[in-house]
């Protein structure tokens, strides 16, 4: 017993030493960039706050307290920030981009999960998770112009086709659990016509989609999710027998699934893939793996070169059997992917500027920065860790 308690005590002391005794709990849930990547914002889910950090990410410059936790943020051409907040009666806030003062506050559906400003329609688009809808909102009047029925629990979206279309990631499959195939579907919404013009089904078993990112040229989209092996007997858990952590690649020109690659290796899992981004130079894909406390960094150029060769039947790695087997191949990313520990618990969000990657440890209250090679890691403690509360500890054990 002593051998177990001593290391745990040391960890607790080290965590305690990094924040003041009277510090309030801060659980950094999401990160956003504004002002063309010059401004970094972090959310505090425990305190319903939106915090603007200094340019080096080392201190909080401004903050605003809202009605409930922030789920998403976008910026309009005037520089104002539009923020949607969690809850059965969600709220949409308009904030002054410089002062963070509240300009307006509007009720906005059941759990608005993502928001973006469209330069094509000059309006705001909001995914309503538990309404299973996409809303178009006039920023001048803040009134709903259009409601579009989409898939089950939409959680994230990204523009493509010159911003004239939206690719929407739905969290859960719509079909019953006895169906085959059973998988999450993505919706394609045409902005000018305000209609769903296509649907893309992810591989059988795809569930818990969390995030979608698009490259600068809007050629490919990347979606994080799990693949659950519903049709297999539950007689083992290792090597992805029951579930795997996955990145699906969407060909936006063809508007169809290209393939899916496993973030796991045969020896370790990249548990709970949360946020995904493409770095501004289009050279890397970064995934925040919240359950394994690390970032998964993929060489995007090498990935697409490998996929092109595999499509032609080349054996690009020793484990590749065929193109159709790639979604089951835990060795496909060998040599073009690495794992970067975030030195904390629960990294859920990730953003990147021209020279830095930022993530945030949700349970241990740290903003983490590093260079684009995953080196020179720095941590800034934001407050008391959520992991030190009963609710936070239970939540951490569950996730």
Predicted regions located by residue number:
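Short, solvent-exposed loop/turn segments at conserved positions within beta-propeller repeat blades
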Residues: 45-46, 86-88, 129-130, 176-183, ...
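Residue position within the beta-strands of beta-propeller blades
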Residues: 42, 83-84, 126, 168-169, ...
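A short beta-strand motif characteristic of beta-propeller blades
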Residues: 19-23, 59-64, 101-106, 143-148, ...
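Short, conserved, GDST-rich strand-edge loop motifs in beta-rich repeat architectures
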Residues: 169-183, 223-244, 297-312
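Residue-level detector of Asp-centered blade-edge/turn motifs that repeat once per structural unit
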Residues: 35-37, 75-79, 118-121, 161-163, ...
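Surface-exposed loop and turn segments in beta-propeller and other repeat-based domains
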Residues: 196-206, 254-271, 308-341, 382-396
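Beta-strand-rich domains and repeat architectures in extracellular enzymes and scaffolds
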Residues: 21-49, 71-72
């Amino acid at each position: 017993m002593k051998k177990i308690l001593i290391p745990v005590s040391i960890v607790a002391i080290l965590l305690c030493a990094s924040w003041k005794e009277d510090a309030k709990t801060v659980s950094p849930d999401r990160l956003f960039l504004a002002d063309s990547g010059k401004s970094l914002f972090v959310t505090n889910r425990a305190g319903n706050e939106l915090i603007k950090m200094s340019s080096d990410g080392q201190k909080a410059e401004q903050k605003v307290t809202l009605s409930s936790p922030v789920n998403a943020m976008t910026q309009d051409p005037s520089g104002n920030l539009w923020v949607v907040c969690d809850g059965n009666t969600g709220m949409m806030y308009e904030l002054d981009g410089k002062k963070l003062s509240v300009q307006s506050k509007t009720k906005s559906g059941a759990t608005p999960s993502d928001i973006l400003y469209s330069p094509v329609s000059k309006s705001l688009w909001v995914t309503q998770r538990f309404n299973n809808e996409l809303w178009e909102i006039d920023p001048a009047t803040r009134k709903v112009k259009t409601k579009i029925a989409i898939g089950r629990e939409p959680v994230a979206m990204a523009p493509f086709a010159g911003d004239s279309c939206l690719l929407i990631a739905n969290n859960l499959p719509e079909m019953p659990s006895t169906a085959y195939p059973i998988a999450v579907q993505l919706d394609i919404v045409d902005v000018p016509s305000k209609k769903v013009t296509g649907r893309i089904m992810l591989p059988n078993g795809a569930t818990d989609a969390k995030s979608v990112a698009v490259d600068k040229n809007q050629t490919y989209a990347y979606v994080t999710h799990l693949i659950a092996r519903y049709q297999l007997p539950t007689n083992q858990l290792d090597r992805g027998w029951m579930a795997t952590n996955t990145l699906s690649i969407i060909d936006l020109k063809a508007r169809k699934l290209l393939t899916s690659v496993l973030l796991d290796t045969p020896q370790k899992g990249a548990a709970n893939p949360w946020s995904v981004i493409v770095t501004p130079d289009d050279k890397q894909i970064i995934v925040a793996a919240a359950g394994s406390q690390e970032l998964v960094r993929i060489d995007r150029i090498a990935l697409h070169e490998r996929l092109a060769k595999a499509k032609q039947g080349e054996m690009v790695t020793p484990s590749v059997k065929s193109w159709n087997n790639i979604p089951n191949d835990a060795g496909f990313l060998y040599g073009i992917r690495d794992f970067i520990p975030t030195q904390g618990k629960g990294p859920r969000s990730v953003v990147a500027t021209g020279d830095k990657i930022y993530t945030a440890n949700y349970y241990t209250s740290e903003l983490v920065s590093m260079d684009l090679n995953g080196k020179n890691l720095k941590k800034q403690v934001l407050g008391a860790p959520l992991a030190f509360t009963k609710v936070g500890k239970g939540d951490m054990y569950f996730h």
